[in-house]
Design a protein with these regions (language model features):
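A generic "folded-domain core" signal
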Residues: 2-164
Length: 164
């Protein structure tokens, strides 16, 4: 039994690691929709915990990476309630595995969705690809600065080939 235990522990650890990686991969949703001029492909993930973005209760925040034939590549956050306070542009504090970065953000003047672009989409993609944990602090109109945390370790970069 003493001889078998180390090998058994190693097998258990590998199984737990594989299970954790599968859980992290399942957090991401990938889209591939036909649009005029080609296909829009995307990778999206919800925040680990809901965030109160309007003073009326907590809701998930979504981080999306999109590749569109007409609009190109973009990364943005989407709220279910409240609004971003970033119409003239803003600076976002992004923490990737404990290391702080500052990226530019902007809120488009549209009512289609409550979205805010992370303007340096290439850098955010690189951080998401290389990190396990990503948090983004963003300004809201109603309740000031809020932070959404994402478990990004399961991102499958090959699903958005033009981003790599």
């Amino acid at each position: 039994a003493a001889r078998v235990k180390p090998k058994l522990d190693e097998i258990k650890a590998k199984a737990e690691e594989a299970q954790q990686q599968a859980r992290l991969q399942a957090l991401w949703a990938y889209g591939n929709e036909p649009v005029k001029g080609g296909a829009q492909i995307s990778a999206a993930i919800y925040s680990q915990e809901p965030v109160d973005t309007d003073g009326g209760g907590s809701h998930p925040v979504r981080l999306i990476f999109r590749d569109h034939p007409d609009w190109g590549r973009s990364s943005y956050l989407v709220l279910e309630a409240g609004d971003f306070d970033c119409y003239g542009g803003c600076r976002l504090k992004v923490i990737a595995d404990g290391k702080t970065h500052t990226l530019p953000g902007s809120r488009p003047k549209t009512d289609d969705a409550i979205a805010m672009f992370v303007e340096d989409h290439k850098r955010l993609w690189k951080l998401a690809k290389e990190s396990k944990q990503l948090s983004i602090e963003f300004p809201t109109k109603a309740v000031g600065k809020k932070t959404a945390e994402f478990e990004v370790g399961g991102l499958e970069p090959d699903k958005l080939p033009k981003w790599n």
